[in-house]
């Protein structure tokens, strides 16, 4: 698995993820890029779960964003509907976080499209550790990127499926 986190604070939205790819109990790769910009570069997405499944879902989300430009919520809901009802997609094992300047969403294979509270959310094997760490840091004066990095570091210290090779994408919300 992996850990992906988003933090929305101080006019920034940050998504960060670690780089570990595991096959069973073996680390196969330590520098995978599981957080990236999609669409026209105005949406950031991160995934946890089976890599091939996640790429399939990212491609589908990009197509939905082409259908519904500038409407991340609508694109995410349409993807979740397809994911839940399509026989092939229903078997995909992945979760996604997506964010643009106005909204952050968690998308699951159960058809859930969730907008987090408190300015942060996390998914993956170390998601609960990262989420708790970020929540604890949200009331400090630390900027969004520092909170995301620190939360992932804490998750990587605890979760064997998360490493310290962190990739960060950032959007300016106020521009």
Curated annotation (Swiss-Prot):
Reaction(s) the record says it catalyses: ATP-dependent cleavage of peptide bonds with broad specificity
Catalytic residues, chain numbering: 2
EC number of the protein: 3.4.25.2
Keyword vocabulary terms for this entry: Allosteric enzyme, Cytoplasm, Hydrolase, Metal-binding, Protease, Sodium, Stress response, Threonine protease
Activity regulation annotation text: Allosterically activated by HslU binding.
Main location: cytoplasm
Residues that coordinate or bind Na(+): 156, 159, 162
GO cellular component: HslUV protease complex; proteasome core complex
GO biological process assignments: proteolysis involved in protein catabolic process
An example molecular function term from Gene Ontology annotations: threonine-type endopeptidase activity
Subcellular location field: Cytoplasm
PROSITE patterns: PROTEASOME_BETA_2
Task performed by this protein: Protease subunit of a proteasome-like degradation complex believed to be a general protein degrading machinery.
Assembly information from the UniProt record: A double ring-shaped homohexamer of HslV is capped on each side by a ring-shaped HslU homohexamer. The assembly of the HslU/HslV complex is dependent on binding of ATP.
Membership in a protein family: Belongs to the peptidase T1B family. HslV subfamily.
Name used for this protein in its record: ATP-dependent protease subunit HslV
Organism: Rhizobium etli (strain ATCC 51251 / DSM 11541 / JCM 21823 / NBRC 15573 / CFN 42)
């Amino acid at each position: 698995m992996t850990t992906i986190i988003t933090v929305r604070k101080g006019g920034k939205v940050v998504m960060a993820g670690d780089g570990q790819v595991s096959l069973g109990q073996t680390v196969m790769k330590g520098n995978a890029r599981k957080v990236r910009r999609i669409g026209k570069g105005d949406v950031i997405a991160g995934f946890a779960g089976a890599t091939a499944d996640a790429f399939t879902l990212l491609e589908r989300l990009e197509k939905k964003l082409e259908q519904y430009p500038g409407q991340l919520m609508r694109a995410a809901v349409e993807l979740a509907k397809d994911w839940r009802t399509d026989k092939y997609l229903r078997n995909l094992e992945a979760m996604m976080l997506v964010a643009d300047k106005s909204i952050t969403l968690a998308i699951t294979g159960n058809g859930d499209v969730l907008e987090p509270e408190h300015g942060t959310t996390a998914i993956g094997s170390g998601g609960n550790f990262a989420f708790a760490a970020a929540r604890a840091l949200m009331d400090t004066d630390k900027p969004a990127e520092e909170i995301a990095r620190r939360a992932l570091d804490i998750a990587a210290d605890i979760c064997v499926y998360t490493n310290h090779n962190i990739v960060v994408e950032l959007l300016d919300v106020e521009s």
